[in-house]
Every structure is written in C-alpha cells, then in structure tokens.
C-alpha cells in the first residue's frame, strides 16, 4: 500500500487538511494465504482467487513460501448451546464472557448448529490467522452489553475464505461483518438479523472480496462506502 495508491483512493486526508487519521504507507497491505496448484515459469496458478487487482503502477507483490507446524486443521464445533452467565441485576453487564467461539491459527474448520446467548462481543469471530472456515445454521440472541464500541459484532471475520450461511442474529450492532484488511474472499449467504442496532458490512478499512447474498437486515443497513474519519480513520471499508 504505497502513498500514491492511498492518495488515489482519497484516503490520505479525511478533510480539513489534517492527515493524522489518514491511511499510512504499508499499513493497508493485504496478505493472502494460498496454495500454488501449478507453476509454469513466472506464472502461478492459485487454489483460490485474489480479491483485488494487482498493478505494478501501485507497488509490487511478493510470493512467500512458508510452513506452519502445529496449525490447527479439520476441527469443528457443533450441536451445542453456549450461554454467557451475567449478573441479572445489571441488564447491560459487561463483566462476563464476550466471545462464544474464536478461530485462530486454523484452517478448514467449522461451527455448525450452535445456539449463542448473552455474549457481549461476538458469537463467532474468525481471527486474521483463520482460513477456510464455515459457520452455518447458528443463532445468536439476547446479547448483554452496552451499545457502542466493538460490542455485538455477532458473526465477524478478520480472516479469509470464510463462509457464514443460514445464520441468525438478534439485537446485534454489526450482525454480519468483516474487519480491518480482511483479505477475503468472505461470504455471508442466506443470513437474517432482527432489531439490528448498527450496519452490516465491513466495519473497518479495506476488507476485500466481501459478498452478501440473500441477507436480510431488519432495522439497519448494509454498508459499502468510505467511512471517512469513523472508526479512527477507516476510509473505504471495502
């Protein structure tokens, strides 16, 4: 992410001539986790598409070979109810569990048919090191928290090649969302929310390859736009 590219998308300065919240060189790099299925000279065929155009005009791309001993794979969670125990005297109590399931340092994993209740943060969050994850037929209701900040990002990915399908959320803030520079592709398919308190979509900067297909959001919007100074200078969210 070069200075020239950042300026070309209008995210170096968010008004007033003040650049403190603007994107900085090298901070918006995307890192795709792929397998090379074929190599022919200087041409590589990958196992999954990349989510933005590569143009030498705006900088260079590196291909790095790596190994990951101990990376979690082929693991799943299904047919459960997970509920966070909160202080019933405080309807917006936050001194209790925030996250139902967090997927990190893992690939080819799944969460299926899980019922989540009362979590303040996320029912399911796929961290930046999560790839090839499926979350399906899950329900999140009755979250307990204040309204604001990074709360109630119900089904949330910062990773790549994530599929959320047939998931339901009630009273979330960002019911179906992607995070900062989520490399993608990430998809939300046949998902529904009710009484949404905030928008769905990317909630931070430049989450690429984001698909919403047959998603109903009751009470708020699906947002693909330049968020400007919001979220500490998010700029284009996708």
Enumerate the predicted regions with their spans.
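Extreme N-terminal leader/anchor segments
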Residues: 3-7
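Beta-strand-enriched cores of mature, soluble protein domains
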Residues: 8, 19-20, 216
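Short, charged/polar low-complexity linear motifs in solvent-exposed/disordered segments
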Residues: 12, 63-64, 129, 143
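Small/polar beta-strand repeat architecture
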Residues: 13-94, 98
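Residue-level marker of regulatory loop/turn positions in helix-turn-helix DNA-binding domains and
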Residues: 25-28, 69, 95, 103, ...
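Glycine-rich, histidine-containing beta strand-loop boundary motifs that form or position
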Residues: 48, 126-128
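Extracellular beta-strand/beta-solenoid scaffold signature
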Residues: 57-67, 91-102, 118-122, 147-156, ...
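Right-handed parallel beta-helix
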Residues: 73-84, 107-118, 130-145, 158-174, ...
